[in-house]
Amino acid sequence: MEDTVIVGRHAVREAIITGHPINKILIQEGIKKQQINEILKNAKDQKIIVQTVPKSKLDFLANAPHQGVAALIAPYEYADFDQFLKQQKEKEGLLTVLILDGLEDPHNLGSILRTADATGVDGVIIPKRRSVTLTQTVAKASTGAIEHVPVIRVTNLAKTIDELKDNGFWVAGTEANNATDYRNLEADMSLAIVIGSEGQGMSRLVSDKCDFYIKIPMVGHVNSLNASVAASLMMYEVFRKRHDVGEI
């Protein structure tokens, strides 16, 4: 199986810290060592090979801004849904998962993972078809959060929603019409929040499975938000409802 390339100091640092299998770290020639001291120290501690390479090689591998650092790592693995449910049952307190219905932009997924980590979301569920996967671009956009938030890839979102309901989750769909203001969202239950695709929103089969619908009110001339922005607002609203000011 071919290595996956990740780039950027945050993504590489988190991959090392979390123990993700790393074949090699590539450092740009001439980069100031004080900028990557933590990466170099952790790599040495874990006996990871560090190789200095020309900037042109990093440019070729990354095809994106790389901050002078890249790593060749084992491909990202998806969490198993059944195992995920088993692990969640062992936790105390209310749970939150995101269901991304047809999201295709890797930058959006990376940004969502970053906010999911910040707000303590327990997992993110994506479908196997017509969806972004875990890639180098997602890893960099997540600034390392990809190492901390379980991503579950499933064949059938509608069936997965049924299983979540059987395990005590209430499912909230995001919808522009006939929906409750998200600021009135009740968060005193385990929640699965569905975010639709950038262009089409939720699919009908998924929408029909939702227990209720929430919307983000807008007063401007553009009547939609980027999927990662909408997801972030939802995640932080749940976080706000469950944590008092000053608690964290």
Swiss-Prot record:
Annotated GO MF terms: RNA binding; RNA methyltransferase activity
InterPro entries noted in UniProt: Alpha/beta_knot_MTases, Ribosomal_eL30-like_sf, rRNA_MeTrfase_TrmH, SpoU_MeTrfase, SpoU_subst-bd, tRNA_m1G_MTases_N
GO cellular component: cytosol
Statement: the UniProt record of this protein carries the keyword Protease: no
SUPFAM superfamilies, A to Z: alpha/beta knot, L30e-like
Sequence positions that bind S-adenosyl-L-methionine: G196, I216, L225
Stored Pfam families: SpoU_methylase (PF00588), SpoU_sub_bind (PF08032)
EC number: 2.1.1.-
Transmembrane intervals: none
Keywords for this protein: Methyltransferase, Transferase
GO biological process: methylation; RNA processing
Protein family membership: Belongs to the class IV-like SAM-binding methyltransferase superfamily. RNA methyltransferase TrmH family.
Protein name: Putative TrmH family tRNA/rRNA methyltransferase
Species classification: Bacteria, Bacillati, Bacillota, Bacilli, Bacillales
